[in-house]
A protein has these predicted regions:
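Interaction interfaces in information-processing and related assembly proteins
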Residues: 3-186
């Protein structure tokens, strides 16, 4: 059918039909909420970079955050870069996103395998370690905006919550998760 053909073309172009972002605004734009499903994007990154489960979880969290933060930018040519650099085995993660929420990224050491944390979960914080989160917004001005904060936990979401409060003075709550299947797919 023509719909199946279009879906295949979109997939080739990197447009994932099942991934989406929902935005909500309340209280005269004083409150904003974003929710995203990025399963296909994260699974594609896992396959393309042959990432271990903990590397997939770390990259997936940052890809999702990048996509949501990308759509917060106004200009069509605006580019957002998120960089996590830590002393853990992953060493670093870099993600770039545009204002349409299209995102790509990589992990410096994609094949890291470490034991689960005390809760029996993938230990993203342990794999990232101590370091910093840098947010670069290139909005076509002479110089890009660069904000940097120390990593709070290395778990990505808490680090972004801290970034929004410290660098952008925006009280926020950020939650990010990547559910891995037993066969290591997303």
């Amino acid at each position: 059918s023509s719909q199946e053909k279009k879906a295949k073309q979109n997939k080739k172009r990197g447009k994932f039909m099942s991934d989406y972002i929902v935005r909500a605004i309340a209280a005269d734009s004083q409150i904003r909420a974003f929710a995203a499903v990025t399963t296909e994007t994260v699974e594609t990154a896992r396959k393309d970079h042959n990432t271990s489960p903990v590397a997939t979880a770390a990259l997936g969290r940052l890809l999702t955050a990048g996509s949501m933060m990308g759509v917060m930018m106004k200009g069509d040519k605006d580019i957002l870069t998120l960089q996590v650099k830590g002393d853990g085995l992953l060493q670093g993660i870099t993600v770039t996103a545009d204002s349409k929420g299209r995102v790509k990224g990589y992990v410096v050491e994609p094949d890291v395998i470490i034991p689960a944390n005390a809760k029996g979960k993938l230990d993203v914080g342990g794999a990232v370690g101590h370091g910093f989160l840098q947010v670069i917004k290139d909005m076509g001005l002479k110089e890009p905006y660069v904000g940097q904060v120390a990593l709070q936990t290395g778990e990505i979401a808490e680090d972004l919550t801290y970034y929004f409060a410290a660098s952008e003075q925006v009280p926020s709550a950020v939650g990010l998760g990547v559910l891995m299947n037993k066969d290591n797919t997303v």
